[in-house]
From Swiss-Prot:
Pfam families: Pyr_redox_2 (PF07992), Pyr_redox_dim (PF02852). The keyword Mitochondrion does not apply. It comes from Salmonella typhimurium (strain LT2 / SGSC1412 / ATCC 700720). Its main location: cytoplasm. GO terms for cellular component: cytosol. It is an enzyme of class 1 (oxidoreductase). Keywords: Cytoplasm, FAD, Flavoprotein, NAD, NADP, Oxidoreductase. Its cofactor is FAD. Coiled coil: none annotated. It catalyses: NAD(+) + NADPH = NADH + NADP(+). GO terms for molecular function: dihydrolipoyl dehydrogenase (NADH) activity; flavin adenine dinucleotide binding; NAD(P)+ transhydrogenase (Si-specific) activity. FAD binds at residues 36-45. This is Soluble pyridine nucleotide transhydrogenase.
Length: 466
C-alpha cells in the first residue's frame, strides 16, 4: 500500500464488525486506526445490546431456576432481586469485556482514537474529539462499522422518563410492576422473558400475526405457549395510534381501539444505522431509509475503497456474523479479494427464557421447496441430564432428507439451546457425504449429557422411515 496517507485503513466503530476488521488488518501488516465515539471500546454489542441483555437474562433465569427447584420450594426461601441489583451484574460483565477488548487493540498495536468522525472527502476524515478539538486524518481505505441504534419514530417522546428504548432500558431506576413492550421481534421477546421472570406484568404488542415469523413454526408456537403459560399477554396484529406519557406511567392507544396503561413502555420496533453523522453525502454514498448501506460480496460499498460491515449493512445483524464480515472485509481490503465467505447456514440464538436456536431450513421452507424430508425429535424431559438439573422444558428437532439422510435444518427450544445447536451445525458443515443424521446413531455420547438429545432425535427420525 502507498504510504502517503496517515493510515493504510481507518475503521469507524469498535464493535464486533470493527474489531474483526481491525484485527484482520493489523495481522496483515496494515497501519490501522479505529475510531470509537464513546469512552470505551466494544460498541453497542458490549455496552447496550448483546452482553448486558444476556447478562440480565442469565441472572433472571438463575433466580427462576432456584425458585422452581423442589429443594428450595418453601416460600421462606424464595430468591428475589431488584432490577438495579441485576443491572450491577451486567455492569461487571461489561467492564470485563471492555478491558479484554481494549487489551486486544493494545497487544496488536492498533491505535484507538476517540471522538465523532465524518467524511470531508473520499480519503479524509474530520475527528471531533471529546475535548472539543477537531483533527483531520487521511487513509487509503475505510471500513464503516458504526453499528445501529434503536429506531425512534417522531411521534414517540423518548425524553419522557417512563418511555424507554432497548438502550435506555439499561438505565431503568424504578421497579415497574407492569410494562408494555412494543415490538415482538428478538429484542422485544428477550425483554418480555426478562421482565416476566422478575414477576413484572408484561403486555407484548406484536405488529405481525405470530412471534418471530422467521423461525420454524413449532419453535415460534413453543415460545408463544411458554409466554402464555407464564402470564405474558401477547397482542398480535396491533399498531399504536398514540402514546401518552403521564406522571405515573404510559398510556398506549392502539389503532384497533384498545387502550393499555402500564408503569413504563419499552419501544423495541426496529433499528437504524448510525450513518447520519458520517456526512456520507461528501463522498457520494447513499443509505436507505433505515440508514443502511448496500455492499457487494466483499463488503465494498459503491466506493471501492470504502467497506461496510455489521448492523450498518442490515441482515443478518448478528454480532457473530459482524465479526466474520469484518475479517473478510480486511482480507479483501489488503489482497483485493477474499477467499473466506460467510457460511451459508448462519446459526441464530434467541435468548428468551428458555432459549431458541436454529440453523438451516425450517419445515415451512422445505415444504415450499417440495423437499422430501423427515423429522426426528427429542424431548428434554426424556433425557437423564435434563431430569438431573431440572431442565425438563425443551425439545430438539432435526430435519433430514428421507433418501440421502442429509441434515437440512436443526431447531432447538430450551435452556442451553444456543450451545446445543453447534453440535449439529458442525455435522451439517461436513462435505463429501459427512453430513448425515446417521452420524448421531453411530457415535458415542457422554452420558448423561444434553448432547445426547441428538442421538435420541436421530433414532426417532430414522425410525419413521420405511
Amino acid at each position: 500500500m502507498p504510504h502517503s496517507w496517515d493510515y493504510d485503513a481507518v475503521v469507524i466503530g469498535s464493535g464486533p464488525g470493527g474489531e474483526g476488521a481491525a484485527m484482520g488488518l493489523v495481522k496483515q501488516g496494515a497501519r490501522v486506526a479505529v475510531i470509537e465515539r464513546y469512552h470505551n471500546v466494544g460498541g453497542g454489542c458490549t455496552h447496550w445490546g448483546t452482553i448486558p441483555s444476556k447478562a440480565l437474562r442469565h441472572a433472571v433465569s438463575r433466580i427462576i431456576e432456584f425458585n422452581q427447584n423442589p429443594l428450595y420450594s418453601d416460600h421462606s426461601r424464595l430468591l428475589r432481586s431488584s432490577f438495579a441489583d441485576i443491572l450491577n451484574h451486567a455492569d461487571n460483565v461489561i467492564n470485563q469485556q471492555t478491558r479484554m477488548r481494549q487489551g486486544f487493540y493494545e497487544r496488536n498495536h492498533c491505535e484507538i482514537l476517540q471522538g465523532n468522525a465524518h467524511f470531508i472527502d473520499e480519503h479524509t476524515l474530520a475527528l471531533e474529539c471529546h475535548d472539543g478539538t477537531v483533527e483531520t486524518l487521511t487513509a487509503e481505505k475505510f471500513v464503516i462499522a458504526c453499528g445501529s441504534r434503536p429506531y425512534h419514530p417522531n411521534d414517540v417522546d423518548f425524553s419522557h422518563p417512563r418511555i424507554y428504548d432497548s438502550d435506555s432500558i439499561l438505565s431503568l431506576h424504578h421497579e415497574p410492576r407492569h410494562v408494555i413492550i412494543y415490538g415482538a421481534g428478538v429484542i422485544g421477546c428477550e425483554y418480555a422473558s426478562i421482565f416476566r421472570g422478575m414477576d413484572v406484568k408484561v403486555d407484548l404488542i406484536n405488529t405481525r400475526d405470530r412471534l418471530l415469523a422467521f423461525l420454524d413454526q413449532e419453535m415460534s408456537d413453543s415460545l408463544s405457549y411458554h409466554f402464555w403459560n407464564s402470564g405474558v399477554v401477547i397482542r398480535h396484529n396491533e399498531e399504536y395510534e398514540k402514546i401518552e406519557g403521564c406522571d405515573d406511567g404510559v398510556i398506549m392507544h392502539l389503532k384497533s381501539g384498545k387502550k393499555l396503561k402500564a408503569d413504563c413502555l419499552l419501544y423495541a420496533n426496529g433499528r437504524t444505522g448510525n450513518t447520519d453523522s458520517l456526512a456520507l453525502e461528501n463522498i457520494g454514498l447513499e443509505t436507505d431509509s433505515r440508514g443502511q448501506l448496500k455492499v457487494n460480496s466483499m463488503y465494498q460499498t459503491a466506493l471501492p475503497h470504502v467497506y461496510a460491515v455489521g448492523d450498518v449493512i442490515g441482515y443478518p445483524s448478528l454480532a457473530s456474523a459482524a465479526y466474520d464480515q469484518g475479517r473478510i472485509a480486511a482480507q479483501a481490503l489488503v489482497k483485493g479479494e477474499a477467499t473466506a465467505h460467510l457460511i451459508e447456514d448462519i446459526p441464530t440464538g434467541i435468548y428468551t427464557i428458555p432459549e431458541i436456536s436454529s440453523v438451516g431450513k425450517t419445515e415451512q421452507q422445505l415444504t415450499a421447496m417440495k423437499v422430501p424430508y423427515e423429522v426426528g425429535r427429542a424431548q428434554f424431559k426424556h433425557l437423564a441430564r435434563a431430569q438431573i438439573v431440572g431442565m425438563n422444558v425443551g425439545t430438539l428437532k432435526i430435519l433430514f432428507h428421507r433418501e440421502t439422510k442429509e441434515i437440512l435444518g436443526i431447531h432447538c427450544f430450551g435452556e442451553r439451546a444456543a450451545e446445543i445447536i453447534h453440535i449439529g451445525q458442525a455435522i451439517m458443515e461436513q462435505k463429501g457425504g459427512g453430513n448425515t443424521i446417521e452420524y448421531f446413531v453411530n457415535t458415542t455420547f457422554n452420558y448423561p449429557t444434553m448432547a445426547e438429545a441428538y442421538r435420541v432425535a436421530a433414532l426417532n427420525g430414522l425410525n419413521r422411515l420405511f
